[in-house]
């Protein structure tokens, strides 16, 4: 695979017999023993993902917090040091540049963790709007990351650190040692389960990976990462979010704070909110036989009303489900629509999201 980057754990994936695929400019493991098995391990036990391909961008300076707040839709001014927030970052027209996590060290230092495939675009966007007294540093190449996810994530990670992990609350982080390695550990994830995202220097990646492997943690690939986030109805950029899809249409209005100072896209998003949404992301459950896939058309009352953004067989729920962007007339829960699969309309019903909620 030409010109693809490799994470520091590439050799470990090969040793484990992973099937490697290109993803966002990287050569990444899509599966090891199988997507279904890896998915179920995370839902019922514990699994780990190499997510070293993610982008890390540091924002520092006296005005760092105000600048971050100008870049993003959510409000970081409400955070304490050691807090993480989920947010979108928009273009002036309200379309989405990316969704990301913002880590607050202090009012003068933030870390933004962005999607791998969007890192260069995000960095260019941030630099385009950069204020004079703010420094923007791309830390992606000097940062590796493992996501440890599942009901037993804390129990397992606690074996490798003296730090009491109960002190890291949901969407909080701490700088601690894991297996003797200095790490940033946050209680975050992309699976719908409890878990941690662990950041460290690339040369120490194999040490942490193998310590976790020795504790019986199942490695999981991008395939299971996708089916897990799908069941939890977490958006994937290029599917539920894009330059053409605003956070409001994606159902992320809770991450758009209109009551803060000006931010990029505020005017356009406010206008969209005040005019009322014309379309939005909904959940679909197939009634007829067939698996809905991204791009498939959705028909209601004999006319096209939207398209599937993500669809698959949901392994834990054992159902054919989809997320779809549909016109408001077809968005009410219980509405029956047709998904066009191989030229034929297959019946589906609009259902509530998320499909899967931990503990339910």
Curated annotation (Swiss-Prot):
Catalytic activity: N(6)-[(R)-S(8)-aminomethyldihydrolipoyl]-L-lysyl-[protein] + (6S)-5,6,7,8-tetrahydrofolate = N(6)-[(R)-dihydrolipoyl]-L-lysyl-[protein] + (6R)-5,10-methylene-5,6,7,8-tetrahydrofolate + NH4(+)
Top EC group: transferase
Signal peptide: none
Keywords annotated in UniProt: Aminotransferase, Transferase
Source species, domain of life: Bacteria
GO molecular function: aminomethyltransferase activity; transaminase activity
InterPro entries cross-referenced by the UniProt entry: GCS_T, GCS_T_bac, GCST_C, GCV_T_N, GcvT/YgfZ/DmdA, GcvT/YgfZ_C, TrmE/GcvT_dom1
GO biological process, one term: glycine decarboxylation via glycine cleavage system
Entry-linked SUPFAM superfamilies: Aminomethyltransferase beta-barrel domain (SSF101790), Folate-binding domain (SSF103025)
A Gene Ontology cellular-component term: glycine cleavage complex
EC number: 2.1.2.10
Role description: The glycine cleavage system catalyzes the degradation of glycine.
UniProt subunit comment: The glycine cleavage system is composed of four proteins: P, T, L and H.
Family membership: Belongs to the GcvT family.
PANTHER family registered for this protein in UniProt: AMINOMETHYLTRANSFERASE, AMINOMETHYLTRANSFERASE, MITOCHONDRIAL
Protein name in the entry: Aminomethyltransferase
Lineage, uppermost ranks: Bacteria, Bacillati, Bacillota, Clostridia, Thermoanaerobacterales
């Amino acid at each position: 695979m030409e010109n693809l980057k490799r994470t520091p754990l590439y050799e470990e994936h090969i040793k484990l017999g992973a099937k490697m695929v290109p993803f966002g400019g990287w050569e990444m493991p899509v599966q090891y023993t199988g997507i279904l098995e890896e998915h179920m391990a995370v839902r019922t036990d514990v699994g780990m993902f190499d997510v070293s391909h993610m982008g890390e961008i540091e924002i520092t300076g006296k005005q760092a917090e105000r600048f971050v707040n100008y870049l993003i839709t959510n409000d970081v001014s409400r955070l304490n040091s050691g807090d993480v927030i989920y947010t979108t970052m928009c273009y002036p027209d309200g379309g989405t540049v990316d969704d990301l996590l913002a880590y607050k060290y202090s009012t003068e230092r933030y870390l933004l963790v962005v999607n791998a495939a969007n890192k260069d675009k995000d960095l260019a966007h941030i630099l385009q709007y950069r204020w004079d007294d703010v420094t923007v540093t791309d830390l992606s190449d000097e940062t590796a990351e493992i996501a440890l996810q599942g009901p037993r994530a804390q129990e397992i990670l606690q074996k490798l650190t003296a730090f009491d992990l109960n002190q890291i609350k949901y969407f909080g982080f701490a700088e601690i040692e894991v297996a003797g390695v200095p790490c940033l550990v946050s209680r975050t994830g992309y699976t719908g389960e409890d878990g941690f995202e662990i950041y460290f220097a690339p040369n120490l990646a194999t040490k942490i990976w193998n310590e976790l492997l020795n504790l019986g943690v199942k490695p999981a690939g991008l395939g299971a990462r996708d089916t897990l986030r799908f069941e939890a109805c977490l958006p994937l950029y290029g599917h539920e979010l894009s330059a053409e899809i605003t956070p409001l249409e994606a159902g992320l209005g809770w991450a758009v704070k209109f009551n803060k100072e000006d931010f990029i896209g505020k005017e356009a998003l406010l206008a969209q909110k005040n005019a009322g949404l014309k379309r939005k992301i909904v959940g679909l459950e197939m009634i007829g036989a067939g698996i809905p896939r991204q791009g498939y058309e959705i028909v209601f009352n004999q006319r096209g009303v939207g398209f599937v953004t993500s669809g698959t067989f949901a392994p834990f729920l054992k159902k054919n489900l989809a997320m779809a962007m549909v016109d408001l007339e077809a968005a009410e829960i219980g509405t029956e629509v047709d998904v066009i699969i191989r030229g034929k309309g297959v019946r589906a019903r609009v259902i509530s999201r998320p499909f899967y909620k931990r503990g339910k």
